[in-house]
Amino acid sequence: QVGYVYYGNFSSGVGESNLDNMFLHFKDCKGIIFDVRNNGGGAMSNSDRITQRFLEEKILTGYVMYKKGNGHNDFSTPYPLYLSPSDRLCWQKPVIVLTNRHCYSATNNFVSTMRLLPHVTIMGDRTGGGSGFPFTTELPIGWSVRFSACPILDADKKHTEFGIDPDQEVAMTKEDMQKGKDTIIEAAISRLLSGSELSEPDINKISPEILAD
């Protein structure tokens, strides 16, 4: 009745056909649990590709600021970032994204965008942050330096660098840990099965060759 996906690294490539097949596999489910706990980040392109499958329309996802001088606060005015829905199979049933303090970088951005969607609930713990675009260089002494060069703001122009709070905070209990039970997944399942109004995924947007499979 409930679909479950764990995505542990946004550096791992995600193909469009893989996403099509995933949503078809879960088409009879009441909702999906999308688990990104302990995901340290990776490629923003993968984050966007997945997020597009949950959109109904083009949305403002946030803002980015670029360095324009040597001063501490010499940044450009916030530049808006937008994301459009995929032209393939999209999912509009309930989704619960599981997070914890080990969600960084592209994962932080993924959560920042997904929480804007009305059918998505963020559950677990605050993310780790670190959402700015990274810059890497080498000092004359041979040391490598990596830092966030372009601050990213959310759709309300608030900094996300220090993490994003969940819609519903859930922590692992000692009792469940001793039993090998995942408190957060159990809470997500209970929420999805609680009887929310559901909508069907748009099968018309999937390619004919995938439907034939």
Where are these regions (language model features)?
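Gly/Ser/Thr-rich loop/hinge elements
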Residues: 41-94, 132-138, 149, 153, ...
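Extracytoplasmic/peripheral linker and loop segments enriched in polar/acidic and small residues
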Residues: 85-86, 167-208
